[in-house]
Structures are given as C-alpha cells and as structure tokens.
Design a protein with these regions (language model features):
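Sec-dependent bacterial lipoprotein signal peptides
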Residues: 1-17
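OB-fold and OB-like single-stranded nucleic-acid-recognition modules
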Residues: 17-160
Length: 160
C-alpha cells in the first residue's frame, strides 16, 4: 500500500512541475490560425502563440502581428523557423511597449476570434484571424548555453 501511494505522490508532484501558467489554463478550440483563416470561426475561444512580427500601438489598444507555432505542454511556443501554423493578429486594450515586445519574442494569447482582417505580406493578400486577447503572456528570453566538451586527460576511454 505504501509503494502505490508513494508512486502516486511522485506522479502528482512531477506533473505539477510541467503545468501551464495559471492565466493560460482552460479549454480552447483545437484549430490553428491557418485553419481559422480558411473558414469562418468567429466567436471561438482560442489559445494561440508564436513569434512577434510587429507590434502596433494604437490610441486605446495594442495589436500584435504574430507568426503562429505549435504550443508545448506549458503553452509556450516551440521555436522552429519552419513550423508555422499561419499568422494572426491579437489585440488587447492598453499600451504594450514595442521595446519590450520586440520582434521574434515568444508570446501566448488567449481570447476570442472577433473577425478577420486582410493585410499584405509582400504583394500577397493574407487573411488574418483577429483575436480580442484576454491574456497576453510574454515568455522569458531563451538563454543560449554553449556546451563545451573537453577530451579526457588520460589516453583511455571511460572513467576508470
């Protein structure tokens, strides 16, 4: 009886380590911005994230043009240049400083799709889903760590 109880406690503790931040928890529609742009999904509650393309402060709100990527278990966007789920625009009341929310920072939004907006990407007309964001979650910058491996000081392999 003690072993299963200990195993259960360890499982619960380990699961707590990989949880989502509280503002990003909840039930959300499972489709991507690309899928939303192909059909009308107005009113759906979504949790999308990705990398910032540009930030547009307006008189009463701030809009973010985003490249969407898949979200991990913690709702943080994966960082992969070729893994895109389309683009979207997320707007939130208030001022968000473009110096802090700079290009390529990772952000996760929750909110409701309020409509669609046509914008140009180069010469291409792109249909952006527009999200009225309830939560704007800016993730910390990922630190790059250079791992340096040095050869062993002895001429044979192994630790002995």
């Amino acid at each position: 009886m003690k072993i299963p109880l200990t195993a259960l406690a360890a499982t619960v503790l380990l699961a707590a380590c990989a949880s989502q931040p509280r503002p990003l928890q909840g039930e959300f529609a499972p489709f991507t911005p690309r899928e939303a742009a192909e059909s009308d999904r107005t009113g759906a509650v979504v949790r999308w994230g990705g990398r910032i393309v540009q930030v547009e402060p307006q008189p009463d709100s701030t809009c973010f043009e985003m490249i969407a990527t898949r979200l991990g278990v913690t709702a943080r966007p994966y960082w992969a240049s070729d893994d895109t789920g389309g683009r979207f625009i997320a707007c939130r009341t208030g001022f968000y400083d473009p110096a802090v929310f700079e290009k390529n920072r990772e952000v996760t939004f929750t909110g409701r799709i309020s409509g669609y907006e046509m914008r140009k990407i180069g010469a291409y007309d792109y249909r952006f889903p527009r999200v009225d964001a309830d939560v704007v979650y800016l993730w910390p910058v990922r630190e790059q760590v250079d791992v340096i491996t040095r050869p062993a000081p002895w001429p044979w392999w192994g630790w002995w």
